[in-house]
Curated annotation (Swiss-Prot):
Belongs to the TRAFAC class translation factor GTPase superfamily. Classic translation factor GTPase family. EF-Tu/EF-1A subfamily. It catalyses: GTP + H2O = GDP + phosphate + H(+). GTP hydrolase that promotes the GTP-dependent binding of aminoacyl-tRNA to the A-site of ribosomes during protein biosynthesis. This is Elongation factor Tu. It comes from the Bacteria. Residues 136-139 are annotated as: G4. Monomer. Pfam families: GTP_EFTU (PF00009), GTP_EFTU_D2 (PF03144), GTP_EFTU_D3 (PF03143). It is an enzyme of class 3 (hydrolase). InterPro entries: EF-Tu_GTP-bd (IPR041709), EF-Tu_GTPase (IPR050055), EFTu-like_2 (IPR004161), EFTU_2 (IPR033720), G_TR_CS (IPR031157), P-loop_NTPase (IPR027417), Small_GTP-bd (IPR005225), T_Tr_GTP-bd_dom (IPR000795).
Length: 395
C-alpha cells in the first residue's frame, strides 16, 4: 500500500477515548496509531508511552493526560487519553483538552459500568457533541447474542443522556487483537476511524464565532481615548466595528473600536488568539476595568445565577481538607477576575466532599457576561479549590 504524506492542511479535530477503567481505552489508542502507521499516517505509540501520562496544570489543577497525534486520509487528529477516572472528570470539566467528539470504549465482556455512565453524563453536560462507540474485547465473548445485548444497553444509555443512541455508529472489535497485528481486528480499527471521520463533525473555528475579548487592563492615551487590553477569546474585530462592554454590575456600555494595536503596531483587525489593545471611542477609563468583556453587541448577556457541573479538589491535590455545605461562599474566577458567589446544593445533598464532582447552583454578588459552557475556577483566598463549567443560566 502506498504511503500517504503527512499533511498539515487537513482539517483538524480534537477527540479522546472515554469509558470505564480497564475497558481498553489506552490499548485502543495504541492500536489506532499502529494501524494508521502502516499507511504512514501516524507514529506508533506503545501502550506504556501513552499510559505514562505527563502531568499538566490547568486552572490550578493537576491533570495527567496523554496527547497522541495521528491522521486519517481525510483529517488530522489530536487524541487525548487519561490514565485515571479522576483525570477524565477534571479534564472534561476544566476543558484542559477540548474534545470535539469522543470514542466511547465499552468492553463486551462487562457491558456498561458506573464510569461508562459517568463519562456519558459528563460528555453531555460539558458539550462533547458526538460519540462513536467501540465495543471492545468481542473476541473474548463466545455468544454473539451477548454482544447484541451489550450494544442495546449502550444505545439505551446514550439515549438516556440525550445522545442519538439509535444512529450512533457502534463498531465491534478487539483493540488488543489489532495491536497484535491480527488482520481481522486491524480492519475493525480502520472501520472505527472511517466512522469517526464521517460521524464527528468538524468544529466551528473560534475565528468564525461572535467576537469576545475579556478585559485585562485599561489605560488612557492623551488625545486618543481609552485603550482596553486583553487576549481575543473568539471571533474577529475590525477598526470601525461597534462593540458592547459588559459585566461587573456596571451598565452595558456601547462603543466603536477606532484602533487595534498589537506589539505597538497599528492593525486594521485582530482575531482569536491575538493579544491586543482596542482603542474605544467615547469611553471613560474609569468606567471599564478588568473582569468586563468587550463583545459583538447583543451576543452575550450579563447574569448572576447559574447551574454548573463542578469538580472539587481533593486534599492531596491541594484542595480543601473538609467538606463544604449549603450557602458556601467562595470566589468564582471567570476569565480574568474573581467574583464572590453563594452555593446552593441540590435537594438531598447535605455536603460536598473534597474529590467529589456534582451539579450545583450559584448566585454571584455581581453580574458577569456568561453563557452556557463558560468555565471557571473556584478559589478561596487565591487558592484553587475546584473547577466548573456552566450548564444552565438561571436568571
Amino acid at each position: 500500500m502506498a504511503k500517504e504524506t503527512f499533511d498539515r492542511s487537513k482539517p483538524h479535530v480534537n477527540i479522546g477515548t472515554i469509558g470505564h477503567v480497564d475497558h481498553g481505552k489506552t490499548t485502543l489508542t495504541a492500536a489506532i496509531t499502529k494501524v494508521l502507521s502502516k499507511r504512514g499516517l501516524a507514529q506508533v505509540r506503545d501502550f506504556g508511552s501513552i499510559d505514562n501520562a505527563p502531568e499538566e496544570r490547568e486552572r490550578g489543577i493537576t491533570i495527567n493526560t496523554s496527547h497522541v497525534e495521528y491522521e486519517t486520509s481525510k483529517r488530522h487528529y489530536a487524541h487525548v487519553d487519561c490514565p485515571g477516572h479522576a483525570d477524565y472528570v477534571k479534564n472534561m470539566i476544566t476543558g484542559a483538552a477540548q474534545m470535539d467528539g469522543a470514542i466511547l470504549v465499552v468492553a463486551a465482556t462487562d457491558g456498561p459500568m458506573p464510569q461508562t455512565r459517568e463519562h456519558i453524563l459528563l460528555a453531555s453536560q460539558v458539550g462533547v457533541p458526538n460519540l462513536v462507540v467501540f465495543l471492545n474485547k468481542v473476541d473474548a465473548v463466545d455468544d454473539p447474542e451477548l454482544v447484541d445485548l451489550v450494544e442495546e444497553e449502550v444505545r439505551d444509555l446514550l439515549k438516556a443522556y440525550k445522545f442519538d443512541g439509535d444512529n450512533i455508529p457502534v463498531i465491534r472489535g478487539s483493540a488488543l487483537g489489532a495491536l497484535n497485528g491480527e488482520p481481522e481486528w486491524e480492519a475493525k480499527v480502520e472501520e472505527l476511524m472511517d466512522n469517526v471521520d464521517e460521524y464527528i463533525p468538524l468544529p466551528q473555528r473560534l475565528i468564525d464565532r461572535d467576537f469576545l475579548m475579556p478585559v485585562e487592563d485599561t489605560m488612557s492615551i492623551t488625545g486618543r481615548g481609552t485603550v482596553a487590553t486583553g487576549r481575543i477569546e473568539r471571533g474577529v474585530i475590525n477598526v470601525g466595528d461597534p462593540v458592547q462592554i459588559i459585566g461587573m454590575g456596571a451598565q452595558n456600555l456601547n462603543s466603536t473600536v477606532t484602533g487595534v494595536e498589537m506589539f505597538r503596531k497599528l492593525l486594521d483587525r485582530g482575531e482569536a488568539g491575538d493579544n491586543v489593545g482596542l482603542l474605544l471611542r467615547g469611553i471613560d477609563k474609569e468606567k471599564i476595568h478588568r473582569g468586563m468583556v468587550i463583545c459583538k453587541p447583543k451576543s452575550v448577556t450579563p447574569h448572576r445565577k447559574f447551574k454548573a457541573e463542578v469538580y472539587v479538589l481533593s486534599k492531596e491535590e491541594g484542595g480543601r481538607h473538609t467538606p463544604f455545605f449549603n450557602k458556601y461562599r467562595p470566589q468564582f474566577y471567570f476569565r480574568t477576575t474573581d467574583v464572590t458567589g453563594e452555593v446552593k446544593l441540590p435537594a438531598g445533598v447535605e455536603m460536598v466532599m473534597p474529590g467529589d464532582n456534582i451539579a450545583l447552583e450559584v448566585e454571584l454578588i455581581n453580574e458577569i457576561a456568561m453563557e452556557k459552557g463558560l468555565r471557571f475556577a473556584i478559589r478561596e483566598g487565591g487558592r484553587t479549590v475546584g473547577a466548573g463549567q456552566i450548564i444552565e443560566i438561571l436568571d
